[in-house]
């Protein structure tokens, strides 16, 4: 039995998966388009093996859980970042499968999904913004089911997601920042807190910062790598966007602190000898091992609690940088440059190997406020 065929359409290849006849004698076929003949052939061969083994499921028999497994592994996983994949796995395993998984794919309705959103918010306590992430996943998964003709009508066309709530960023006042900088002095959080407060870095940029990115002689630091976390796995990659890759000016206070940290690192290398983890990262523990991003956030949160300081997350030191820049009268364009935001103005002209001094005023303005607040603390 043939079980299907491959037809070239332009530069793409369309596979017809033949499932034989259903109970009413009607022949059941499914179609899917692939970019290369190799991919199309591999998919058709896999279909043939399942048909021969008797493990192939008719499209009409697919449960939503089975579709999610196929969509995640074969369609979306090759297209997304590891951190996104980790989030999708969690949503599918912990929420979608338990609540909707047993429903036949072709029987899944807009009402089922709308009730699912209510369940997430009322029973599971998820925020509307988090539920919107579930909505986006469902839209992607069911659009794929529709395009591959597993469903004839997409229920997502009649589903209304919850209204997105605008997140109001929290940040420290100059006085609060001064107290934080005073209390963090001499602790293992001193360097990471100063870097985030004085430069406005993202957590991933902070954790991905290497000494090879730091030029103490010319007082610059180049932001071009990140280190993030998906579950227990740490992921090293480039910056978030093209405009996130940037070279920043190092104010005197931070430059001196980095020089001290470099000297301290040499002392630790001598003390720990062969067990020292010499990896070139700037933000490390005494034995040279880099801080895991989530652990660094946990340490920061605990430090604030232990010292009766207002609760913010580590990323909100970046918001503090933006707020203090604005308070210092720095033009918004220069603040965006320092933060590495993607805007039409900055994406047109990105300098990664030369220092763009348009942002220097922002960095120096925040440094002046922070230094003054620290002295008063």
Where are the model-predicted features located?
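N-terminal DNA-binding module of tyrosine recombinases/phage integrases
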Residues: 9-111, 261-278, 371, 377
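C-terminal secondary-structure termini that scaffold catalytic or DNA-interacting sites
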Residues: 182, 218, 231-260, 264-267, ...
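A short, basic/aromatic helix-end/turn motif that makes direct DNA contacts
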Residues: 33, 208-214, 336-342, 352
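Short, basic (Lys/Arg/His-rich) helix/loop patches that form interaction surfaces
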Residues: 124, 128, 182, 186-189, ...
């Amino acid at each position: 039995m043939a079980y299907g065929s491959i037809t070239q359409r332009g530069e793409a290849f369309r596979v017809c998966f033949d499932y034989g006849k259903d109970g009413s004698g009607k022949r059941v076929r499914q179609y899917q388009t692939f970019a290369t003949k190799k991919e199309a052939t591999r998919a058709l061969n896999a279909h043939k093996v399942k048909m021969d083994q008797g493990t192939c499921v008719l499209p009409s028999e697919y449960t939503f859980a089975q579709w999610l497994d196929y969509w995640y592994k074969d369609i979306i996983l090759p297209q997304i970042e590891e951190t996104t994949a980790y989030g999708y796995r969690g949503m599918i395993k912990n929420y979608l499968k338990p609540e909707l998984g047993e429903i036949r794919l072709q029987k899944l309705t807009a009402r089922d999904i709308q009730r699912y959103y209510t369940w997430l918010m009322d029973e599971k306590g998820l925020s509307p913004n988090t539920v919107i992430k579930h909505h986006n996943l469902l839209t992607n998964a069911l659009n794929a089911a529709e395009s591959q003709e597993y469903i004839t009508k997409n229920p997502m066309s009649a589903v209304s997601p919850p209204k997105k709530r605008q997140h109001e960023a929290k940040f420290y006042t100059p006085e609060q920042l001064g107290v934080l900088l005073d209390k963090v002095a001499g602790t293992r959080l001193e360097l990471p807190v100063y870097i985030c407060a004085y430069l406005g870095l993202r957590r991933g940029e902070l954790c991905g910062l290497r000494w090879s990115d730091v030029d103490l002689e010319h007082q610059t630091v180049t932001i071009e790598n990140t280190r993030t976390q998906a579950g227990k796995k740490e992921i090293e990659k480039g910056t978030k966007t093209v405009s996130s890759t940037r070279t920043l000016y190092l104010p005197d206070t931070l430059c001196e602190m980095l020089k001290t940290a470099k000297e301290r690192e040499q002392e630790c290398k001598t003390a720990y000898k062969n067990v020292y983890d010499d990896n070139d990262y700037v933000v490390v523990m005494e034995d040279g091992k880099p801080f895991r991003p989530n652990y660094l956030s946990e340490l920061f949160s605990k430090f604030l609690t232990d010292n009766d300081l207002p609760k913010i997350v580590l990323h909100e030191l970046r918001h503090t940088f933006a707020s203090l820049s604005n308070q210092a009268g720095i033009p918004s364009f220069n603040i965006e440059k320092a933060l590495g935001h993607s805007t039409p103005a900055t994406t047109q002209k990105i300098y990664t190997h030369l220092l763009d001094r348009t942002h220097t005023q922002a960095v120096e303005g925040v440094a002046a406020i922070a230094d003054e607040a620290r002295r008063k603390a």
